[in-house]
């Protein structure tokens, strides 16, 4: 699970561990990884099944090394292979009219380029080793809206990439889907210290919870989701789906 130290990725890790999986979470900060693993390992049932890996989603040149490191880690825990990739890492930013080229590249490199090449690597690994598995891409309901930021452009890209990967990998027993959260109560979206999940701009009147997104992720990569292929599952509370024509949104 890339970007697993906080927010949706952290709660996905918790949900996967609760379901019995061995989990590798990645992040750029060794300290944040240590804190996240410390919190998750407070549950004794998860110990021995959780591994951390320092990885920058923009450093495509290091992906082979980092993936081999992940294989070594799970192998030391008795797992013969990795069969699920969750492309979750992402950053916001680079909106018109004030976006800089540097900010634009950071968003696209993290949210789209990194996902493309990590999926290329992982898909090749599954095919070469005849492992049936899953790729789950974390998109955004913003991919339903007109794009005026690098973030939204990147999520449009994730939507298309999910379809392409699903079609090309399905014959090899690899299931690819996307999950597209709407406004979610995570540190990336909520203001510092905000603990009120009320969101009057959302048809259900509140933000989605990362736990809700994580529970759906478990379904999509489990046998329960085997016939769901190439889909983006929108978990928005209605934002961008029943209000898709509303340009006055805050994420």
Give residue ranges: language-model regions:
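Substrate-binding pocket helix/loop in short-chain dehydrogenase/reductase
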Residues: 95-108, 198
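Short C-terminal tail/terminal secondary-structure segment
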Residues: 218, 229-251
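Short, small/polar-rich loop/turn modules that mediate ligand/substrate recognition or access, typified
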Residues: 170, 175, 228-230
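Conserved NAD(P)H cofactor-binding loop of Rossmann-fold oxidoreductase domains
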Residues: 88-93, 238
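Residue(s) in the substrate-gating loop at a strand-loop-helix junction
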Residues: 140
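Active-site helix of classical SDR
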Residues: 119, 154, 162
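Conserved glycine-rich cofactor-binding loop
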Residues: 5-6
